[in-house]
Amino acid sequence: VTASPLQGSAESLARPVEVLAGTDLDEHKSGTLGDTVAKLPGVQSTFFGPGVGRPIIRGQEGPRVQVLSNGVGNMDASTVSADHATSIEPFLADQIEVLKGPATLLFGSGAIGGAVNVVDGRIASELPDRPLSGRAELRGNSVNDERSGMFRLDGVNGNWVLHVDGLVRDTD
């Protein structure tokens, strides 16, 4: 038996969260959101062919797992039909949060199995500290002959913020 000298809040105990960001996210990125988070404990990916992978959290999938983009529900056909890919692109993500347990009910009854929130910066939550910033990424995969590229630019002028991103993927 072990004890902690620091008392945790009830919310932190009931809120198991996995966060992929930075180098961890770069190493986990895959062609689908499900494949990107599949290496986390308790998480798997559906498979209905290449390019279609939605998260399965603790055995729950489909409408029981809420997929969010910047905290807003993703209304796409992947929720009700397994042969549709989710419209959220993991290559553009700044961080991906996977929530499991009772705290997911804060996102509504549709999140009874869990929630995956992709934070991609498309909607600015604060003014950037630099007038112009960006990133680009190129990837290749010899197994499925994949070639993909991504770019992102963020700019600020006074109280106006501009965000532009793009992705191209070619695979066999």
Residue positions per predicted region:
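Acidic, small-polar-rich N-terminal luminal/periplasmic segments of exported/outer-membrane proteins
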Residues: V1-L127
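Predominantly transmembrane beta-strands of Gram-negative outer membrane beta-barrel pores used
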Residues: Q66, Q95-L99, A115-D172
